[in-house]
Amino acid sequence: MKTKKPFFILLSIIFVFINSILYAQIEIPRNLKHAYEKGTRSLDGSPGPNYWQNFSDYTINVLFIPSERKLIGREKIIYNNNSPDILNRIVLRFYQDLFKKGSPREFQVNPSDVHDGVVLKKLFIEGIPVDLNDKSKANQVGTNLNIKLDSSLFIYPKSQTLFEIEWELTIPKFSNVRMGTYDSTSFSLSHIFPKFLD
């Protein structure tokens, strides 16, 4: 009879411990709590009633010169600001700058494939040219070009802005990462065009 009492005490402690774990309140991380309060996220993880997402529509024309392994591109991009915020800067992403001299990369590339990266020739915002040599207007960090907008070109909520760009890119000859050359007539082209972080 005496051996049953410690067993029931131990069983009771285990029962209380398991129930306290099962019914304990899990603390909601601050960033998620803020999203719940703003209505951009629901408690079940789905988008909330105030959820928004920016997006871009691209019209891309590319000339490929196989003998030079060169791409010459023109893009018209309509950027759609669906956020409640006024945007005073925007980021253009150059995925292929992983072959640019000095770019950090997580893999080895053939030294002869390292080049100047995506060469941005022209950038227009609503038809107004951006001085690409002015680092206060367009400053590249890694594979991102940070574009600071003049107040007359701020992107207002629920509005669209037209960006036009011209660029050039050399396809690597020996390193086939995201793109590459297989022989004189076979190429792999992926992530070739500059795009916005939406």
Tell me what each language-model feature is:
Residues M1-K2, L10-L11, I147:
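Generic low-polarity alpha-helical segments
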Residues F7-F8, P47:
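Generic hydrophobic alpha-helical membrane-segment signal
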Residues I9-N19:
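Bacterial N-terminal signal peptides
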Residues A24-D198:
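Acidic/His-enriched low-complexity segments
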